[in-house]
Regions:
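A short, Lys/Arg-rich alpha-helix, primarily the initiator
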Residues: 1-17, 72-101, 146
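Helix-turn-helix DNA-binding elements, focusing on the entry/boundary residues of the two helices
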Residues: 21, 104, 132
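Short alpha-helical "recognition helix" segments of helix-turn-helix
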Residues: 23-25, 106-108
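Recognition helix of helix-turn-helix/homeodomain-like DNA-binding domains
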Residues: 29-44, 112-127
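DNA major-groove recognition helix of helix-turn-helix/homeodomain DNA-binding modules
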Residues: 47-63, 129-145
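Conserved, charge-rich beta-strand/loop surface module that forms ligand/interface-binding patches
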Residues: 89-105, 114, 120-125
Length: 150
């Protein structure tokens, strides 16, 4: 569990909160082996991460940001249409792609996945966290993870 890179924030949270792997399994309604598998693979779905933090009484927010360029305007107006009643887990990803003019076709090529894969992520409103890290690296973005009590 100490070798985690993608889930390092989760390992640190569990240590700080005093939450064991057994407790995570009980909260999530899965076996200890499933939790162990997440840490061995160093990956889990965004929906699973958000659900776990909600069950622990915390809110986790992901954001993808690029470093501000010197030639950009200091004011940024972002119009984002997100259905508040609908799924919003990957809204941060959609907003970042729109804000930085990243086409889904070019992103699919950089990640070496099909366009259908990206379509399925947004249709199901879920993807593995390792892909979020891969997108951040491919598009020279920083993944910001904020955790706060509910």
């Amino acid at each position: 569990m100490n070798k985690a890179r993608n889930l390092r924030f989760l390992v640190d949270f569990m240590k700080a909160a005093g939450v064991s792997t057994n407790q995570v399994a009980q909260l999530m309604g899965v076996s200890r082996q499933a939790v162990h598998h997440w840490f061995v693979k160093d990956d889990m779905k965004v929906s699973q991460i958000q659900r776990l933090f909600e069950l622990c009484g915390y809110r986790i927010v992901f954001a993808l940001e690029k470093e501000a360029a010197a030639d950009t305007l200091p004011v940024r107006v972002t119009m984002s249409v997100v259905n508040p009643a609908g799924p919003q887990r990957l809204a941060f990803l959609k907003n970042a792609l729109d804000r930085y003019d990243v086409s889904r076709e070019s992103l699919a090529a950089r990640l070496n996945v099909g366009k259908t894969t990206l379509y399925n992520w947004f249709k199901s409103d879920d993807c593995f966290l390792s892909y979020v890290y891969a997108i951040a690296m491919a598009e020279d973005m920083k993944l910001d993870i904020r955790i706060a009590p509910l």
